[in-house]
Amino acid sequence: MMRANRLMGAALVEHDLVKIEDLDGANERLLEIVAQGQARQNTVLGILAYEMKAVREEDVLQYHVDQQGGGAIDLRYYEVPEEYQKGIDTGACWATWSVPFDRKEDFHFVASAYSLSPAVQKYWETQLDGPILWFGTSLEGIADYLGKHESDSVADKTST
């Protein structure tokens, strides 16, 4: 999680989406959040975008599409195949702000708010068998999807 955040922050600075001073402040705030044990708030992008207003998340998504040739997706409007819903490692998804959501032929589709982070890319490349097509999405989109997935998993366990 810390590596994903550190490299995401570095990528935001490298691509001139945030200033180094803002990243330093966001990293300090991130350490406070980690110390408080608020796992789902552990996002340097969220701090920069929503607490500090140093970058708009939309600008990061637009950079992903325009400069990296990736797609964009809102998982609320996509029916994720059952094979991906059942095998999901929610801990890894929360740590990387990414969700594998489909596969066509040899290609895995991964939605990520952290697609600019080399650590996130490398993690999913080692986890998935085959090439990855990256789709940018919002932090809220990932959080909503994972929250619903976790709620559904709890409901399934209590109904059996």
How would you name each of these model-derived features?
Residues M1-S151:
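Non-catalytic accessory regions
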